Amino acid sequence: MKINKLIWTGILSFAVLFNAVAKDAIHQNEVYDIYLTYTDSTYPGDAVFLKISFKENKKLKKKDKTATSAKAKIAFNDKILFNTKFYSVPEKLSKTKNTFIAALPLSSYAKTGTYDLTVIYSYEGEPNMEFTVPVEVNSKDFVEETIPLNAQNTEIKTNTSPERMSQIEKLNGILGTINEDAVYQITPFAQPTTITRRTSFFADRRTFSYSNGKSSTSLHYGIDFGCPNGTHVTSCAAGKVVLAENRISTGYSVVIEHLPGLYSLYYHMDELKVKEGDIINMGDLIGLSGATGLATGPHLHWEIRLFMNAINPDQLCENFLFAPAAAQNK
């Protein structure tokens, strides 16, 4: 992941730097500066992260102030792929005022090339402004594998019972929830286990071979660690436990909310050590690994969802939200 940083003090200088023209031609640098840091080089299945902050140069009258707002969208060949709003970062986490973050997931099938990243914002009642910067999506190869399933796992995989459908609906409802106040951590995340052996990788292209001779294809949404039964599983970041239960397909499972629309998921555990509603820190014990649910052997499945889209968990173990070094060391 490559990071680009921009300090903009006016439309004209920005247009020269990025060969982009703002739709509103008002020169704003007498009122404020905008600082932008964003992911400008990435891979399919990753996310594009953005952070903006404002420095006020001219004191605005209280009557002119309204809430600062911003949105971002990413497009390829003039087709908008995803859009989202920016979310405010508490000053205790960002150590600065007027800091906002946003994230845009990319499909693991995203084509290589230059994408257009557009930011639209309004600072405390000032006119809306818009600018576009380039993001390069590089090529990446993904593993293709065939997984034979015994009769028990075939039954789980093909289970269409009301109970399983209800569990899927509940999980999707959680992953589709965007809590604007849920900003628990903006520093790099950590791996959820000390085990380093990986048995499956993010976005593997899978074919399941059923015991009845049939088959189906799917995408592997996370990373599998080859953990012996009973291995400690820890939270990859601070957050709130929003699901902790035994599910038909994923066994003993935990879902943790970390940022608006961003969740970590932990599957196939043997025992849970947290309950729904718990507020936890990075590294807290949440369960013991196992082989519950659809599993061909003991392992931990770790997954990250952003606005319901699976993204590469390893990216979040980097400085994905551009936190200062001092904040990362805490």
Label each region the model flagged.
Residues 9-16:
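Bacterial N-terminal signal peptides
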